[in-house]
Amino acid sequence: MKKISLPKIGIRPVIDGRRMGVRESLEEQTMNMAKATAVLITEKIRHACGAQVECVIADTCIAGMAESAACEEKFSSQNVGVTITVTPCWCYGSETIDMDPMRPKAIWGFNGTERPGAVYLAAALAAHSQKGIPAFSIYGHDVQDADDTSIPADVEEKLLRFARAGLAVASMKGKSYLSVGGVSMGIAGSIVDHNFFESWLGMKVQAVDMTELRRRIDQKIYDEAELEMALAWADKNFRYGEDQNASQYKRNEAQNRAVLKESLLMAMCIRDMMQGNKTLAGKGLVEESLGYNAIAAGFQGQRHWTDQYPNGDTAEALLNSSFDWNGVREPFVVATENDSLNGVAMLFGHQLTGTAQIFADVRTYWSPEAVERVTGQALSGLAEHGIIHLINSGSAALDGACKQRDSEGKPTMKPHWEISQQEADACLAATEWCPAIHEYFRGGGYSSRFLTEGGVPFTMTRVNIIKGLGPVLQIAEGWSVELPKAMHDQLDARTNSTWPTTWFAPRLTGKGPFTDVYSVMANWGANHGVLTIGHVGADFITLAAMLRIPVCMHNVEEAKIYRPSAWAAHGMDIEGQDYRACQNYGPLYKR
């Protein structure tokens, strides 16, 4: 089957069409703006898979309807999913704009005095607003000379933020969410909403019963040679933690081996269901070899699977990580308990950063007073106002141990194309695999256990669906926190010390849901959240605006908020604008 091509970014140089000297004097400058934009994007941004982003520039500058149509024909034939229009001069507004209503679009009007690039920008944006096709405005803060070919820092920031978010939109379109199983323990996020995926994300939902996973394992619908490789890799790299089960529930060596084997098979089969595996075609299993074109998935697990079979913790943890027995590779997005809405937040984070995501329960708010009462020690530093315990039964990406290092030697989670094998090994070495607690998981399994290093910037997100309103996005930037060992051990043991832990301190603003740490916990809309490396809330806000998903809670500095220009016409309060604009325009892929 032919591999689906990656979306490209189209660059549209627009120009004043008057000949006899006007257009001729602008051709080179205009096309150079387009070329400089393309160079910036290809040098600074990659697709989530690690591939270099390809930019397609119109064959000629665009002065009117004919050249605009020729540009659109070229873009349509080359899978352009995002467009950036650039100009240093006046052009004819509605005659030159990109009219595709589904495609994220921005306009960069050069801030110069010789020609009125800003005037075109304003005219074109007015046309976009009047026609109901929102566009992003890019206009430099400082005047540049006409022969200045540099891209100012503020313009670069907006170009790259727009490009990252736009590529995320284009990359999700046409893909599927693979729902393996149904609703887990009444969790609302696992009531998979087809309309949300179709109307807001342009995706389909592929619903598959968990018996399909059972069939693939039992009938050996997998690469048997790869299974042996995976087992050998686990034997070399897995450190096993304490078995806290009562003696009557402990498994013997042979039983533990069977649990490990099935856990690895679950990872292989879920992966094959998502993306396909040509090896299966060689076994005569052509249908199964195709997969479901899934860019994200969820596994119900509890309880209809886990009451008799190994849980999904090992499979999910390995799939969500940036490495496995095949080496370093792009992480998958697999939501525990089939929480599709947390899966979407994971998908957003991965598409924006190329990194693995930490899926977690937003489990406990620990006030400074409660910590001191329980441990006899006081919280300090980033944790001084209290902390949130982010912990799940072991499905978080192993990258979350933060044993990778940035250019300054600080702990982080890197895009997978920057991760060395040594860093992958360090994450594995920091992880213990603990036998699943029988009371929760009667079928057994292994939960990964690690502790996230402290002082690492993170952005916590969550998508929720509100009846009568639709989807909303929550964002909380903050940091992981490293507690004194004795304090950590006492607090961790009160929940479950066989699961991975991140102690999280959100950045407080003193207002609304960020008045204090308790308020962040109290305003969180569901039991799950996602951690994405870095303070990247501004990118999430831009992406949400493209999809028409309002942001109901965030602590991002106002100067970093970047939404389409038409949002400004929807009132004077910036967050109210977001709600009114999203309601006015409706989901990107209206149904």
Swiss-Prot record:
Cofactor or coenzyme needed: Mn(2+)
Highest rank taxon of the organism: Bacteria
UniProt function note: Converts the aldose L-fucose into the corresponding ketose L-fuculose.
Enzyme class of the recorded protein, top EC level: isomerase
Swiss-Prot/TrEMBL catalytic activity: L-fucose = L-fuculose
Similarity remark: Belongs to the L-fucose isomerase family.
The protein, known as: L-fucose isomerase
Predominant place of localization: cytoplasm
Species the sequence originates in: Salmonella heidelberg (strain SL476)
UniProt keywords, alphabetically: Carbohydrate metabolism, Cytoplasm, Fucose metabolism, Isomerase, Manganese, Metal-binding
UniProt-listed Enzyme Commission number(s): 5.3.1.25
A molecular-function term among this protein's GO annotations: L-fucose isomerase activity
UniProt pathway annotation: Carbohydrate degradation; L-fucose degradation; L-lactaldehyde and glycerone phosphate from L-fucose: step 1/3
A GO cellular-component term linked to this record: cytoplasm
InterPro entries: Fuc/Ara_isomerase_C, Fuc_iso_dom3_sf, Fuc_isomerase_C, Fucose_iso_dom1_sf, Fucose_iso_N1, Fucose_isomerase, Fucose_isomerase_dom2_sf, Fucose_isomerase_N/cen_sf
Active-site residues (renumbered): E337, D361
Matching Gene3D superfamilies: 3.40.50.1070, L-fucose Isomerase, Chain A, domain 2, L-fucose/L-arabinose isomerase, C-terminal
NCBIfam families (alphabetical): fucI (TIGR01089), PRK10991.1 (NF008220)
Pfam families xrefs: Fucose_iso_C (PF02952), Fucose_iso_N1 (PF07881), Fucose_iso_N2 (PF07882)
Subcellular location: Cytoplasm
Oligomer status and interactors: Homohexamer.
Residues that coordinate or bind Mn(2+): E337, D361, H528
GO biological process: D-arabinose catabolic process; L-fucose catabolic process
